[in-house]
Amino acid sequence: MVASSNTGLEREDHQRDADFNKAMHGSSAQARGGVAAMFRKGGAAKQAAVDEYFKHWDNKPAENETPEERAARQAEYATLTRHYYNLATDLYEYGWGQSFHFCRFSQGEPFYQAIARHEHYLAHQIGIKDGMKVLDVGCGVGGPAREIAKFTGAHITGLNNNNYQIERATHYAFKEGLSNQLEFVKGDFMQMSFPDNSFDAVYAIEATVHAPTLKGIYSEIFRVLKPGGVFGVYEWLMTDEYDNDNLRHREIRLGIEQGDGISNMCKVSEGIAAIHDSGFEMLHHEDLADRPDALPWYWPLAGELRYVQTVGDFFTIVRMTTWGRTIAHGLAGLLETFKLAPAGTKKTADSLALAADCLVAGGRDKLFTPMYLMVARKPAA
């Protein structure tokens, strides 16, 4: 039985999305990395994506934001997210890697080792084992799915609403010889095409924040999870220190939402309530950002070179410093001027920079967490 528990959602149109993907991205999904792919876009399609995405944000500052504007973004959550990743995926790969998430850091731990450990920790908390059938909700270009597949031996299905990311994920899985252990499916996670009780376990890493409501996405995950199965999530949430009457707090939240394709970010208390209201039994919940780690989770975005752990990390993090971003964004603007880069590249990069600044501010002031861990079980039948 396939019957989404949600109603009033955007209508899916896979042919439309496939046609747009071809027009904008062409064969760039086969490119070696983010920079190489960035310059192989269809200009008219990219401009359409820029216009469609930024219509929700341009000239709409936090002090004047209305409930109607937030509701409009929620109503178009799928289009908002799809076009965000049409614009941002190559920049993510260039600046961060193929696992689009934050992590905790130990002293002396290289950046990419810390990223992998964060993925392993979630798999361990859920209890993912060899031979399990597992769903990755909002899989990006498949970095976490590949790592968890290798770590556990499970078969992982990645679900994603962006054709380009699906193509990138499939390409990388083939290159690593993991095609038999991984598959990637195009679809809206609010209305999944999978039958009820399909998966032994489900996880989501910083992806369900794109849902219009957390109860809606968690209810859909509950539906496709087998009775007795476990769901684990690293959720993006405003902490309960967030005060919506405080303009600075609202500016931080809106900056994160705009720069990260989010229609409506909730507070921790709302996230916990959504798990319970969806029918799950909560096994564990904790803000991992509150752990007394030697290095803060946001240090790479802050561009604080004093935290660099290895020589290799220096070349990753230097791009995130203020002057590193200034040079990169200036170059993007120059390339646009000479029509060597598609229009909208610099505007997208500037929006990501706004998000980075607001993420750091939210982290430092304990207003935001990208790693609120919730592990919950669907009751056995």
UniProtKB/Swiss-Prot annotation:
This protein's record includes keyword Transferase: yes
Known catalytic reactions: lanosterol + S-adenosyl-L-methionine = eburicol + S-adenosyl-L-homocysteine + H(+)
Single GO molecular function: sterol 24-C-methyltransferase activity
Induction annotation: Expression is positively regulated by the FgSR transcription factor that targets gene promoters containing 2 conserved CGAA repeat sequences.
Keywords for this protein: Lipid biosynthesis, Lipid metabolism, Methyltransferase, S-adenosyl-L-methionine, Steroid biosynthesis, Steroid metabolism, Sterol biosynthesis, Sterol metabolism, Transferase
GO CC annotations on file: endoplasmic reticulum
Pfam families (alphabetical): Methyltransf_11, Sterol_MT_C
Reported function: Sterol 24-C-methyltransferase; part of the third module of ergosterol biosynthesis pathway that includes the late steps of the pathway. The third module or late pathway involves the ergosterol synthesis itself through consecutive reactions that mainly occur in the endoplasmic reticulum (ER) membrane. Firstly, the squalene synthase ERG9 catalyzes the condensation of 2 farnesyl pyrophosphate moieties to form squalene, which is the precursor of all steroids.
Miscellaneous: In Fusarium, the biosynthesis pathway of the sterol precursors leading to the prevalent sterol ergosterol differs from yeast. The ringsystem of lanosterol in S.cerevisiae is firstly demethylised in three enzymatic steps leading to the intermediate zymosterol and secondly a methyl group is added to zymosterol by the sterol 24-C-methyltransferase to form fecosterol. In Fusarium, lanosterol is firstly transmethylated by the sterol 24-C-methyltransferase leading to the intermediate eburicol and secondly demethylated in three steps to form fecosterol.
Name the UniProt record assigns to this protein: Sterol 24-C-methyltransferase ERG6A
Native source organism of the sequence: Gibberella zeae (strain ATCC MYA-4620 / CBS 123657 / FGSC 9075 / NRRL 31084 / PH-1) (Wheat head blight fungus)
Lineage, highest ranks first: Eukaryota, Fungi, Dikarya, Ascomycota, Pezizomycotina
